[in-house]
Protein backbone atom coordinates (compact mmCIF):
# COMPACT_ATOMS: atom_id res chain seq x y z
CA UNK A 1 0.00 0.00 0.00
CA UNK A 2 2.90 2.31 0.82
CA UNK A 3 4.56 1.58 -2.52
CA UNK A 4 1.38 2.57 -4.34
CA UNK A 5 1.70 6.04 -2.84
CA UNK A 6 5.35 6.38 -3.87
CA UNK A 7 5.03 5.38 -7.52
CA UNK A 8 2.74 7.10 -9.99
CA UNK A 9 -0.69 5.52 -10.17
CA UNK A 10 -1.39 6.15 -13.86
CA UNK A 11 1.17 3.63 -15.10
CA UNK A 12 3.73 6.15 -16.38
CA UNK A 13 7.34 4.99 -16.70
CA UNK A 14 10.80 6.41 -17.32
CA UNK A 15 12.61 6.29 -20.67
CA UNK A 16 13.75 2.71 -19.96
CA UNK A 17 10.20 1.56 -19.22
CA UNK A 18 10.60 1.35 -15.43
CA UNK A 19 7.94 2.63 -12.96
CA UNK A 20 8.71 6.15 -11.73
CA UNK A 21 8.59 7.69 -8.28
CA UNK A 22 5.85 10.26 -7.96
CA UNK A 23 7.93 12.47 -5.67
CA UNK A 24 10.96 12.71 -7.96
CA UNK A 25 9.44 12.98 -11.43
CA UNK A 26 6.84 14.91 -13.36
CA UNK A 27 4.72 17.82 -12.18
CA UNK A 28 5.90 21.42 -12.65
CA UNK A 29 9.52 20.44 -12.11
CA UNK A 30 9.49 18.44 -15.34
CA UNK A 31 7.30 20.91 -17.19
CA UNK A 32 9.76 23.74 -16.55
CA UNK A 33 12.15 22.11 -19.03
CA UNK A 34 9.43 22.04 -21.68
CA UNK A 35 8.20 25.61 -21.40
CA UNK A 36 11.37 27.07 -22.94
CA UNK A 37 10.96 25.03 -26.10
CA UNK A 38 7.33 26.09 -26.49
CA UNK A 39 8.27 29.77 -26.14
CA UNK A 40 11.08 29.57 -28.72
CA UNK A 41 9.06 27.42 -31.13
CA UNK A 42 6.18 29.90 -31.05
CA UNK A 43 8.68 32.72 -31.49
CA UNK A 44 9.98 30.95 -34.62
CA UNK A 45 6.52 30.22 -36.01
CA UNK A 46 5.06 33.69 -35.45
CA UNK A 47 8.33 35.29 -36.51
CA UNK A 48 7.64 33.71 -39.90
CA UNK A 49 3.84 33.75 -40.07
CA UNK A 50 3.19 37.30 -38.86
CA UNK A 51 5.34 38.95 -41.55
CA UNK A 52 5.36 36.31 -44.29
CA UNK A 53 2.69 38.08 -46.34
CA UNK A 54 4.95 41.15 -46.56
CA UNK A 55 7.99 39.09 -47.60
CA UNK A 56 5.98 37.38 -50.33
CA UNK A 57 4.62 40.64 -51.75
CA UNK A 58 7.71 42.85 -51.36
CA UNK A 59 10.54 40.36 -51.97
CA UNK A 60 8.95 37.65 -54.12
CA UNK A 61 6.53 39.98 -55.96
CA UNK A 62 3.37 37.97 -55.26
CA UNK A 63 -0.01 39.70 -55.57
CA UNK A 64 -2.37 40.12 -52.59
CA UNK A 65 -4.55 37.08 -53.28
CA UNK A 66 -1.56 34.79 -53.99
CA UNK A 67 0.33 35.94 -50.89
CA UNK A 68 -2.71 35.53 -48.62
CA UNK A 69 -3.40 32.11 -50.13
CA UNK A 70 0.21 30.95 -49.73
CA UNK A 71 0.42 32.15 -46.12
CA UNK A 72 -2.83 30.35 -45.34
CA UNK A 73 -1.72 27.19 -47.14
CA UNK A 74 1.59 27.07 -45.27
CA UNK A 75 -0.05 27.84 -41.91
CA UNK A 76 -2.66 25.21 -42.70
CA UNK A 77 0.06 22.64 -43.39
CA UNK A 78 1.78 23.49 -40.09
CA UNK A 79 -1.46 22.78 -38.22
CA UNK A 80 -2.58 19.76 -40.31
CA UNK A 81 0.63 17.67 -40.25
CA UNK A 82 0.27 17.01 -36.48
CA UNK A 83 -2.34 14.37 -37.38
CA UNK A 84 0.47 12.16 -38.70
CA UNK A 85 2.82 13.03 -35.83
CA UNK A 86 0.21 12.23 -33.20
CA UNK A 87 -0.72 8.92 -34.80
CA UNK A 88 2.93 7.84 -34.93
CA UNK A 89 3.38 8.81 -31.27
CA UNK A 90 0.23 7.10 -30.00
CA UNK A 91 0.64 3.94 -32.05
CA UNK A 92 4.36 3.33 -32.51
CA UNK A 93 7.23 5.22 -30.85
CA UNK A 94 5.68 7.44 -28.17
CA UNK A 95 5.62 11.20 -27.68
CA UNK A 96 9.24 11.66 -26.57
CA UNK A 97 10.90 10.00 -29.58
CA UNK A 98 8.42 11.45 -32.08
CA UNK A 99 9.16 14.90 -30.69
CA UNK A 100 12.91 14.25 -30.79
CA UNK A 101 12.97 13.30 -34.48
CA UNK A 102 10.55 16.03 -35.51
CA UNK A 103 12.30 18.81 -33.63
CA UNK A 104 15.48 18.10 -35.61
CA UNK A 105 13.49 18.40 -38.87
CA UNK A 106 12.01 21.67 -37.58
CA UNK A 107 15.46 23.10 -36.83
CA UNK A 108 16.69 21.95 -40.25
CA UNK A 109 13.82 23.87 -41.84
CA UNK A 110 14.73 27.00 -39.87
CA UNK A 111 18.37 26.71 -40.98
CA UNK A 112 17.29 26.33 -44.62
CA UNK A 113 14.94 29.32 -44.31
CA UNK A 114 17.71 31.46 -42.83
CA UNK A 115 19.91 30.45 -45.78
CA UNK A 116 17.09 31.30 -48.21
CA UNK A 117 17.08 34.94 -47.08
CA UNK A 118 20.85 35.40 -46.56
CA UNK A 119 22.81 33.43 -49.19
CA UNK A 120 23.08 35.67 -52.27
CA UNK A 121 22.38 32.94 -54.80
CA UNK A 122 19.24 31.88 -52.90
CA UNK A 123 17.55 35.27 -52.46
CA UNK A 124 16.44 38.00 -54.88
CA UNK A 125 18.76 41.00 -55.14
CA UNK A 126 17.42 44.31 -53.85
CA UNK A 127 18.48 47.93 -54.34
CA UNK A 128 17.04 50.87 -52.40
CA UNK A 129 14.27 48.66 -51.04
CA UNK A 130 13.19 47.45 -54.47
CA UNK A 131 13.79 43.75 -55.19
CA UNK A 132 14.28 42.06 -58.53
CA UNK A 133 12.01 39.19 -59.49
CA UNK A 134 13.05 35.97 -57.74
CA UNK A 135 14.23 33.07 -59.89
CA UNK A 136 12.42 29.73 -59.94
CA UNK A 137 15.27 28.20 -57.92
CA UNK A 138 15.03 30.89 -55.25
CA UNK A 139 11.25 30.56 -54.92
CA UNK A 140 11.47 26.76 -54.84
CA UNK A 141 14.19 26.74 -52.15
CA UNK A 142 12.21 29.23 -50.05
CA UNK A 143 9.06 27.11 -50.11
CA UNK A 144 10.99 23.88 -49.50
CA UNK A 145 12.34 25.53 -46.35
CA UNK A 146 8.86 26.57 -45.23
CA UNK A 147 7.33 23.15 -45.75
CA UNK A 148 10.26 21.40 -44.06
CA UNK A 149 9.27 23.42 -40.99
CA UNK A 150 5.66 22.29 -41.49
CA UNK A 151 6.77 18.63 -41.51
CA UNK A 152 8.78 19.15 -38.32
CA UNK A 153 5.85 20.88 -36.63
CA UNK A 154 3.78 17.81 -37.41
CA UNK A 155 5.66 15.81 -34.81
CA UNK A 156 6.40 18.51 -32.25
CA UNK A 157 3.11 20.38 -31.95
CA UNK A 158 0.76 17.55 -30.87
CA UNK A 159 3.29 15.83 -28.63
CA UNK A 160 5.04 18.53 -26.62
CA UNK A 161 1.87 19.89 -24.95
CA UNK A 162 0.46 16.38 -24.42
CA UNK A 163 3.81 15.25 -23.05
CA UNK A 164 3.61 18.15 -20.60
CA UNK A 165 0.12 17.11 -19.49
CA UNK A 166 1.43 13.55 -19.00
CA UNK A 167 3.63 14.87 -16.19
CA UNK A 168 0.55 15.13 -13.96
CA UNK A 169 -0.94 11.92 -12.56
CA UNK A 170 -4.70 11.86 -13.19
CA UNK A 171 -5.11 9.44 -10.27
CA UNK A 172 -3.60 11.93 -7.81
CA UNK A 173 -6.05 14.52 -6.49
CA UNK A 174 -3.25 17.04 -5.89
CA UNK A 175 -1.69 16.61 -9.34
CA UNK A 176 -5.06 16.69 -11.05
CA UNK A 177 -5.65 20.10 -9.51
CA UNK A 178 -2.30 21.24 -10.90
CA UNK A 179 -3.23 19.99 -14.37
CA UNK A 180 -6.28 22.29 -14.37
CA UNK A 181 -3.85 25.25 -14.56
CA UNK A 182 -1.30 23.55 -16.80
CA UNK A 183 -2.86 24.43 -20.17
CA UNK A 184 -3.36 28.07 -19.13
CA UNK A 185 0.30 28.50 -18.22
CA UNK A 186 1.46 26.39 -21.15
CA UNK A 187 -0.25 28.82 -23.49
CA UNK A 188 1.17 31.71 -21.45
CA UNK A 189 4.69 30.60 -22.43
CA UNK A 190 3.47 30.26 -26.00
CA UNK A 191 2.17 33.82 -25.90
CA UNK A 192 5.53 35.08 -24.61
CA UNK A 193 7.25 33.61 -27.65
CA UNK A 194 4.64 35.10 -29.96
CA UNK A 195 5.03 38.51 -28.29
CA UNK A 196 8.78 38.60 -28.87
CA UNK A 197 8.19 37.57 -32.49
CA UNK A 198 5.65 40.28 -33.28
CA UNK A 199 7.46 43.01 -31.35
CA UNK A 200 11.14 42.15 -31.83
CA UNK A 201 11.62 39.80 -34.76
CA UNK A 202 9.30 41.67 -37.13
CA UNK A 203 11.20 44.92 -36.48
CA UNK A 204 14.54 43.14 -36.94
CA UNK A 205 13.38 41.59 -40.22
CA UNK A 206 12.32 44.91 -41.73
CA UNK A 207 15.14 47.07 -40.38
CA UNK A 208 18.17 44.86 -39.66
CA UNK A 209 17.69 42.03 -42.12
CA UNK A 210 15.61 38.92 -42.67
CA UNK A 211 18.59 36.66 -42.03
CA UNK A 212 19.01 37.97 -38.49
CA UNK A 213 15.24 37.88 -38.01
CA UNK A 214 15.16 34.16 -38.82
CA UNK A 215 18.56 33.30 -37.34
CA UNK A 216 17.70 34.38 -33.79
CA UNK A 217 14.78 31.94 -33.31
CA UNK A 218 16.86 29.19 -34.95
CA UNK A 219 19.55 29.57 -32.29
CA UNK A 220 16.86 29.86 -29.63
CA UNK A 221 15.30 26.58 -30.74
CA UNK A 222 18.66 24.80 -30.50
CA UNK A 223 19.26 26.13 -26.98
CA UNK A 224 15.75 25.18 -25.85
CA UNK A 225 16.25 21.63 -27.15
CA UNK A 226 19.40 21.30 -25.04
CA UNK A 227 17.42 22.45 -21.99
CA UNK A 228 14.64 19.98 -22.89
CA UNK A 229 17.04 17.02 -22.88
CA UNK A 230 18.63 18.12 -19.59
CA UNK A 231 15.23 17.43 -18.02
CA UNK A 232 15.08 13.83 -19.32
CA UNK A 233 15.60 12.17 -15.87
CA UNK A 234 12.50 13.95 -14.54
CA UNK A 235 10.08 13.02 -17.32
CA UNK A 236 7.20 10.55 -17.09
CA UNK A 237 6.24 8.58 -20.19
CA UNK A 238 2.92 6.98 -21.08
CA UNK A 239 3.15 3.32 -22.07
CA UNK A 240 2.33 2.83 -25.77
CA UNK A 241 -0.80 0.77 -26.28
CA UNK A 242 -0.54 -2.04 -28.83
CA UNK A 243 -4.18 -1.73 -29.95
CA UNK A 244 -4.80 -0.53 -33.49
CA UNK A 245 -6.89 2.52 -32.71
CA UNK A 246 -7.78 3.34 -36.31
CA UNK A 247 -8.91 -0.24 -36.92
CA UNK A 248 -11.08 -0.19 -33.79
CA UNK A 249 -12.73 3.09 -34.77
CA UNK A 250 -13.59 1.79 -38.24
CA UNK A 251 -14.75 -1.59 -36.93
CA UNK A 252 -17.57 -0.16 -34.79
CA UNK A 253 -19.65 1.59 -37.49
CA UNK A 254 -19.12 -1.38 -39.84
CA UNK A 255 -20.39 -3.81 -37.19
CA UNK A 256 -23.32 -1.50 -36.37
CA UNK A 257 -24.26 -1.36 -40.06
CA UNK A 258 -24.14 -5.16 -40.36
CA UNK A 259 -26.48 -5.40 -37.35
CA UNK A 260 -28.75 -2.60 -38.56
CA UNK A 261 -31.80 -4.89 -38.81
CA UNK A 262 -31.39 -6.18 -35.25
CA UNK A 263 -33.31 -4.68 -32.34
CA UNK A 264 -31.12 -3.00 -29.74
CA UNK A 265 -31.94 -4.22 -26.19
CA UNK A 266 -33.65 -1.74 -23.88
CA UNK A 267 -31.21 -2.60 -21.11
CA UNK A 268 -27.65 -1.65 -22.06
CA UNK A 269 -26.36 -4.31 -19.63
CA UNK A 270 -27.40 -6.90 -22.21
CA UNK A 271 -24.81 -5.53 -24.64
CA UNK A 272 -21.48 -7.31 -24.93
CA UNK A 273 -18.75 -6.22 -22.51
CA UNK A 274 -15.70 -7.78 -20.90
CA UNK A 275 -15.30 -8.09 -17.16
CA UNK A 276 -13.86 -5.02 -15.43
CA UNK A 277 -11.03 -7.20 -14.10
CA UNK A 278 -9.82 -7.68 -17.69
CA UNK A 279 -9.34 -3.94 -18.14
CA UNK A 280 -7.61 -3.47 -14.80
CA UNK A 281 -5.24 -6.41 -15.29
CA UNK A 282 -4.30 -5.21 -18.79
CA UNK A 283 -3.84 -1.57 -17.83
CA UNK A 284 -6.74 -0.43 -19.98
CA UNK A 285 -9.61 1.97 -19.31
CA UNK A 286 -13.14 0.64 -19.27
CA UNK A 287 -15.68 3.08 -20.69
CA UNK A 288 -19.27 2.81 -19.51
CA UNK A 289 -22.36 3.07 -21.69
CA UNK A 290 -23.83 6.47 -22.61
CA UNK A 291 -27.28 7.12 -24.16
CA UNK A 292 -25.97 8.94 -27.26
CA UNK A 293 -25.44 7.78 -30.85
CA UNK A 294 -27.56 4.73 -30.01
CA UNK A 295 -27.25 3.34 -33.54
CA UNK A 296 -23.63 2.45 -32.73
CA UNK A 297 -24.83 0.28 -29.81
CA UNK A 298 -25.85 -2.29 -32.40
CA UNK A 299 -22.16 -3.12 -32.84
CA UNK A 300 -22.24 -4.60 -29.30
CA UNK A 301 -25.35 -6.77 -29.77
CA UNK A 302 -24.59 -10.37 -28.89
CA UNK A 303 -25.16 -12.60 -31.92
CA UNK A 304 -24.18 -16.15 -32.80
CA UNK A 305 -22.81 -15.25 -36.22
CA UNK A 306 -19.95 -12.92 -35.23
CA UNK A 307 -17.99 -11.66 -32.22
CA UNK A 308 -19.51 -8.32 -31.20
CA UNK A 309 -17.60 -5.19 -30.30
CA UNK A 310 -17.32 -4.44 -26.60
CA UNK A 311 -19.28 -1.59 -25.04
CA UNK A 312 -15.95 0.08 -24.29
CA UNK A 313 -14.91 -0.06 -27.95
CA UNK A 314 -18.31 1.33 -28.99
CA UNK A 315 -18.12 4.13 -26.44
CA UNK A 316 -14.65 5.13 -27.64
CA UNK A 317 -16.08 5.43 -31.16
CA UNK A 318 -18.98 7.48 -29.78
CA UNK A 319 -16.55 9.74 -27.99
CA UNK A 320 -14.56 10.40 -31.16
CA UNK A 321 -17.78 11.03 -33.11
CA UNK A 322 -18.86 13.57 -30.50
CA UNK A 323 -15.50 15.31 -30.78
CA UNK A 324 -15.87 15.46 -34.56
CA UNK A 325 -19.18 17.34 -34.24
CA UNK A 326 -17.56 19.92 -31.94
CA UNK A 327 -14.48 20.07 -34.18
CA UNK A 328 -16.57 20.93 -37.25
CA UNK A 329 -17.93 24.08 -35.62
CA UNK A 330 -14.40 25.28 -34.75
CA UNK A 331 -13.43 25.73 -38.41
CA UNK A 332 -15.12 29.11 -38.90
CA UNK A 333 -13.55 30.60 -35.73
CA UNK A 334 -10.17 29.41 -37.04
CA UNK A 335 -10.92 31.20 -40.31
CA UNK A 336 -11.42 34.44 -38.36
CA UNK A 337 -8.07 33.94 -36.66
CA UNK A 338 -6.40 33.50 -40.08
CA UNK A 339 -7.03 37.20 -40.78
CA UNK A 340 -4.47 38.27 -38.16
CA UNK A 341 -1.41 37.28 -40.22
CA UNK A 342 -2.89 38.09 -43.62
CA UNK A 343 -5.54 40.73 -44.31
CA UNK A 344 -5.10 42.54 -40.99
CA UNK A 345 -1.41 43.03 -41.86
CA UNK A 346 -2.18 44.20 -45.42
CA UNK A 347 -4.84 46.52 -44.00
CA UNK A 348 -2.25 47.95 -41.62
CA UNK A 349 0.27 48.68 -44.39
CA UNK A 350 -2.16 51.20 -45.92
CA UNK A 351 -2.48 53.24 -42.70
CA UNK A 352 -0.32 55.85 -40.99
CA UNK A 353 2.21 53.82 -38.99
CA UNK A 354 4.33 56.65 -37.58
CA UNK A 355 5.03 57.00 -33.87
CA UNK A 356 6.58 60.40 -33.31
CA UNK A 357 8.54 61.98 -36.15
CA UNK A 358 10.99 59.20 -37.02
CA UNK A 359 9.82 55.76 -35.90
CA UNK A 360 7.47 53.73 -38.11
CA UNK A 361 5.88 50.64 -36.58
CA UNK A 362 5.88 47.53 -38.82
CA UNK A 363 2.30 46.60 -39.71
CA UNK A 364 2.84 43.02 -38.53
CA UNK A 365 3.94 44.26 -35.09
CA UNK A 366 0.37 45.20 -34.28
CA UNK A 367 -0.12 41.47 -33.79
CA UNK A 368 1.76 41.94 -30.53
CA UNK A 369 -1.42 43.42 -29.08
CA UNK A 370 -3.13 40.08 -29.64
CA UNK A 371 -0.39 38.51 -27.56
CA UNK A 372 -0.33 41.26 -24.94
CA UNK A 373 -4.06 40.93 -24.36
CA UNK A 374 -3.55 37.17 -24.01
CA UNK A 375 -0.69 37.59 -21.54
CA UNK A 376 -2.75 39.96 -19.41
CA UNK A 377 -5.88 37.84 -19.63
CA UNK A 378 -4.41 34.41 -18.78
CA UNK A 379 -3.39 35.29 -15.17
CA UNK A 380 -6.69 37.11 -14.66
CA UNK A 381 -8.60 34.11 -15.98
CA UNK A 382 -6.64 31.59 -13.93
CA UNK A 383 -6.31 33.54 -10.68
CA UNK A 384 -9.55 35.56 -10.60
CA UNK A 385 -12.20 34.34 -13.03
CA UNK A 386 -11.83 30.59 -12.32
CA UNK A 387 -11.92 30.88 -8.47
CA UNK A 388 -14.89 33.27 -8.68
CA UNK A 389 -16.89 31.03 -11.01
CA UNK A 390 -15.84 27.90 -9.10
CA UNK A 391 -17.69 29.24 -6.06
CA UNK A 392 -20.76 29.89 -8.20
CA UNK A 393 -20.86 26.61 -10.14
CA UNK A 394 -18.88 24.07 -8.11
CA UNK A 395 -16.93 23.21 -11.26
CA UNK A 396 -13.14 23.00 -10.69
CA UNK A 397 -12.67 24.81 -14.02
CA UNK A 398 -15.14 27.56 -13.10
CA UNK A 399 -17.22 26.97 -16.21
CA UNK A 400 -17.53 23.93 -18.45
CA UNK A 401 -15.12 23.50 -21.34
CA UNK A 402 -17.84 24.13 -23.92
CA UNK A 403 -19.04 27.24 -22.12
CA UNK A 404 -15.48 28.51 -22.30
CA UNK A 405 -15.42 27.90 -26.06
CA UNK A 406 -18.78 29.61 -26.52
CA UNK A 407 -17.56 32.77 -24.79
CA UNK A 408 -14.42 32.78 -26.95
CA UNK A 409 -16.38 32.35 -30.17
CA UNK A 410 -18.73 35.21 -29.22
CA UNK A 411 -15.81 37.57 -28.54
CA UNK A 412 -14.30 36.66 -31.91
CA UNK A 413 -17.53 37.62 -33.69
CA UNK A 414 -17.50 41.02 -31.97
CA UNK A 415 -13.84 41.48 -33.01
CA UNK A 416 -14.47 40.79 -36.69
CA UNK A 417 -17.57 43.02 -36.63
CA UNK A 418 -15.40 45.84 -35.28
CA UNK A 419 -12.84 45.10 -38.02
CA UNK A 420 -15.59 45.59 -40.60
CA UNK A 421 -16.67 48.87 -38.99
CA UNK A 422 -13.07 50.17 -38.92
CA UNK A 423 -12.71 49.25 -42.60
CA UNK A 424 -15.87 51.27 -43.36
CA UNK A 425 -14.20 54.21 -41.58
CA UNK A 426 -11.00 53.70 -43.62
CA UNK A 427 -12.96 53.70 -46.89
CA UNK A 428 -14.64 56.99 -45.89
CA UNK A 429 -11.25 58.59 -45.27
CA UNK A 430 -10.02 57.27 -48.64
CA UNK A 431 -13.03 58.83 -50.35
CA UNK A 432 -12.63 62.10 -48.44
CA UNK A 433 -8.98 62.51 -49.47
CA UNK A 434 -9.48 61.13 -53.00
CA UNK A 435 -6.90 58.37 -52.53
CA UNK A 436 -6.47 56.02 -55.50
CA UNK A 437 -2.87 54.77 -55.42
CA UNK A 438 -2.15 51.45 -53.62
CA UNK A 439 1.03 52.96 -52.13
CA UNK A 440 -0.56 56.16 -50.88
CA UNK A 441 -0.84 56.23 -47.08
CA UNK A 442 -4.34 56.71 -45.70
CA UNK A 443 -4.28 59.56 -43.12
CA UNK A 444 -5.69 57.37 -40.39
CA UNK A 445 -3.67 55.89 -37.51
CA UNK A 446 -2.88 52.19 -37.59
CA UNK A 447 -3.97 52.09 -33.96
CA UNK A 448 -7.57 52.12 -35.17
CA UNK A 449 -6.95 48.40 -35.64
CA UNK A 450 -6.13 47.88 -31.95
CA UNK A 451 -9.66 46.86 -30.82
CA UNK A 452 -9.92 44.00 -33.33
CA UNK A 453 -6.45 42.71 -32.44
CA UNK A 454 -7.00 43.00 -28.68
CA UNK A 455 -10.43 41.36 -28.70
CA UNK A 456 -9.12 38.43 -30.73
CA UNK A 457 -6.43 38.00 -28.08
CA UNK A 458 -8.94 38.01 -25.23
CA UNK A 459 -11.17 35.63 -27.17
CA UNK A 460 -8.24 33.29 -27.68
CA UNK A 461 -7.79 32.89 -23.91
CA UNK A 462 -11.22 31.29 -23.90
CA UNK A 463 -11.06 29.75 -27.36
CA UNK A 464 -7.55 28.45 -28.10
CA UNK A 465 -6.71 27.29 -24.57
CA UNK A 466 -10.21 25.90 -24.16
CA UNK A 467 -9.97 23.92 -27.40
CA UNK A 468 -6.57 22.47 -26.50
CA UNK A 469 -7.80 21.39 -23.06
CA UNK A 470 -11.17 20.17 -24.37
CA UNK A 471 -9.73 17.85 -27.01
CA UNK A 472 -7.04 16.54 -24.66
CA UNK A 473 -9.45 16.01 -21.77
CA UNK A 474 -12.28 14.48 -23.79
CA UNK A 475 -10.19 12.19 -26.02
CA UNK A 476 -9.90 8.48 -25.20
CA UNK A 477 -6.92 7.88 -22.92
CA UNK A 478 -5.10 5.79 -25.53
CA UNK A 479 -5.16 8.54 -28.16
CA UNK A 480 -4.63 11.82 -26.36
CA UNK A 481 -1.85 12.98 -28.69
CA UNK A 482 -4.15 12.25 -31.60
CA UNK A 483 -6.92 13.97 -29.68
CA UNK A 484 -5.02 17.26 -29.54
CA UNK A 485 -4.79 17.16 -33.33
CA UNK A 486 -8.49 17.97 -33.38
CA UNK A 487 -7.27 21.34 -32.07
CA UNK A 488 -4.39 21.74 -34.52
CA UNK A 489 -6.21 20.39 -37.57
CA UNK A 490 -9.14 22.73 -36.90
CA UNK A 491 -6.75 25.68 -37.10
CA UNK A 492 -5.15 24.18 -40.21
CA UNK A 493 -8.41 23.65 -42.05
CA UNK A 494 -9.52 27.12 -40.95
CA UNK A 495 -6.49 28.52 -42.78
CA UNK A 496 -7.24 26.42 -45.86
CA UNK A 497 -10.87 27.55 -45.69
CA UNK A 498 -9.79 31.19 -45.59
CA UNK A 499 -7.51 30.55 -48.57
CA UNK A 500 -10.47 29.08 -50.45
CA UNK A 501 -12.81 31.91 -49.43
CA UNK A 502 -10.51 34.77 -50.48
CA UNK A 503 -9.87 33.05 -53.82
CA UNK A 504 -13.56 32.46 -54.52
CA UNK A 505 -14.64 35.90 -53.29
CA UNK A 506 -12.03 37.51 -55.53
CA UNK A 507 -13.18 35.51 -58.57
CA UNK A 508 -16.88 36.12 -57.96
CA UNK A 509 -16.65 39.85 -57.19
CA UNK A 510 -14.21 40.65 -60.02
CA UNK A 511 -16.22 38.68 -62.58
CA UNK A 512 -17.33 40.73 -65.57
CA UNK A 513 -14.91 43.54 -64.79
CA UNK A 514 -16.33 44.18 -61.32
CA UNK A 515 -14.34 45.52 -58.37
CA UNK A 516 -12.78 42.76 -56.29
CA UNK A 517 -13.46 42.90 -52.57
CA UNK A 518 -9.84 41.85 -51.98
CA UNK A 519 -7.83 43.37 -54.83
CA UNK A 520 -4.14 44.23 -55.07
CA UNK A 521 -5.07 47.83 -54.34
CA UNK A 522 -6.74 47.71 -50.92
CA UNK A 523 -7.44 51.43 -51.27
CA UNK A 524 -9.84 50.51 -54.07
CA UNK A 525 -11.33 47.30 -52.64
CA UNK A 526 -14.21 46.41 -50.31
CA UNK A 527 -12.54 44.56 -47.47
CA UNK A 528 -15.40 45.66 -45.22
CA UNK A 529 -17.76 43.48 -47.26
CA UNK A 530 -15.51 40.46 -46.77
CA UNK A 531 -15.34 41.05 -43.01
CA UNK A 532 -19.12 41.47 -42.97
CA UNK A 533 -19.48 38.16 -44.80
CA UNK A 534 -17.31 36.52 -42.11
CA UNK A 535 -19.55 37.99 -39.40
CA UNK A 536 -22.66 36.49 -41.00
CA UNK A 537 -21.24 32.97 -41.39
CA UNK A 538 -19.81 33.20 -37.85
CA UNK A 539 -23.24 33.96 -36.37
CA UNK A 540 -24.71 30.99 -38.23
CA UNK A 541 -21.82 28.85 -37.01
CA UNK A 542 -22.40 30.04 -33.44
CA UNK A 543 -25.95 28.73 -33.64
CA UNK A 544 -24.66 25.37 -34.84
CA UNK A 545 -22.12 25.32 -32.00
CA UNK A 546 -24.81 25.92 -29.37
CA UNK A 547 -26.86 23.07 -30.86
CA UNK A 548 -23.87 20.67 -30.99
CA UNK A 549 -22.82 21.61 -27.46
CA UNK A 550 -26.34 21.03 -26.12
CA UNK A 551 -26.20 17.46 -27.43
CA UNK A 552 -22.68 16.73 -26.21
CA UNK A 553 -22.20 14.36 -23.26
CA UNK A 554 -18.97 14.83 -21.35
CA UNK A 555 -16.64 11.93 -20.78
CA UNK A 556 -17.51 10.00 -17.64
CA UNK A 557 -14.53 10.19 -15.33
CA UNK A 558 -14.53 8.54 -11.92
CA UNK A 559 -11.36 10.40 -11.02
CA UNK A 560 -13.01 13.73 -11.78
CA UNK A 561 -15.88 12.79 -9.51
CA UNK A 562 -13.43 12.01 -6.75
CA UNK A 563 -11.54 15.24 -7.34
CA UNK A 564 -14.64 17.41 -7.17
CA UNK A 565 -16.52 15.45 -4.58
CA UNK A 566 -18.80 14.02 -7.23
CA UNK A 567 -19.98 17.41 -8.42
CA UNK A 568 -18.05 18.15 -11.58
CA UNK A 569 -19.34 15.57 -14.01
CA UNK A 570 -22.86 15.61 -12.62
CA UNK A 571 -23.00 19.37 -12.85
CA UNK A 572 -21.89 19.35 -16.46
CA UNK A 573 -24.37 16.64 -17.40
CA UNK A 574 -27.23 18.58 -15.81
CA UNK A 575 -26.15 21.74 -17.57
CA UNK A 576 -26.41 19.95 -20.87
CA UNK A 577 -29.82 18.55 -20.03
CA UNK A 578 -31.53 21.66 -18.73
CA UNK A 579 -31.02 24.19 -21.49
CA UNK A 580 -29.42 24.28 -24.92
CA UNK A 581 -27.75 27.52 -23.88
CA UNK A 582 -26.06 25.87 -20.90
CA UNK A 583 -23.07 24.40 -22.66
Curated annotation (Swiss-Prot):
Q: Which residues cross the membrane?
A: 74-94, 99-119, 134-154, 182-202, 210-230, 320-340, 361-381, 405-425, 446-466, 485-505, 529-549
Up-regulation conditions: Down-regulated upon nematode infection.
Q: Which UniProt keywords apply?
A: Membrane, Phosphoprotein, Transmembrane, Transmembrane helix, Transport
Molecular function terms in GO for this entry? dipeptide transmembrane transporter activity; tripeptide transmembrane transporter activity
Example of a GO cellular component annotation carried by this entry = membrane
> Cross-referenced Gene3D superfamilies, in alphabetical order?
MFS general substrate transporter like domains (1.20.1250.20)
List the membrane topology term(s): Multi-pass membrane protein
Where found in the cell? Membrane
Highest taxon listed in the record's lineage: Eukaryota
Q: In which tissues is it expressed?
A: Expressed in flowers. Detected in stems, leaves and siliques.
Pfam families found in the cross-reference section:
PTR2
Listed GO biological process terms: response to nematode
Q: Which residues does this entry mark as bearing Phosphothreonine?
A: 98
Family under the similarity heading: Belongs to the major facilitator superfamily. Proton-dependent oligopeptide transporter (POT/PTR) (TC 2.A.17) family.
This chain belongs to the protein called Protein NRT1/ PTR FAMILY 5.1
